[in-house]
Amino acid sequence: MFKRLYENRDIIEIKVWRVEKSSDKPHGFKYSLVFIRDGKRVIGYDNAERKRDHRHYRGKEYQYSFQGIDTLIDDFFNDVRRFKNEG
């Protein structure tokens, strides 16, 4: 688990667990990556129970194609950078 609280009170939290492979987690990982601003999730990547891999961006949910943990983390931080640049 990784959690960082920034001076402006933004929060980034990353959790990854290795789990038994299943129909909703065929890669054998359960994960939750969130970027929180003003107490609200604005970006999130997860595969909650009975939901396949997906991402949340500014209140909308999108399917996510899991390519591995390193790519997952890169994609998450790319979204965080994009969000911060959009203002």
In which residue ranges do the predicted regions lie?
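The feature represents the first ordered module of a protein
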Residues: M1-H54
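Short, compact, well-ordered microdomains
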Residues: E61-G87
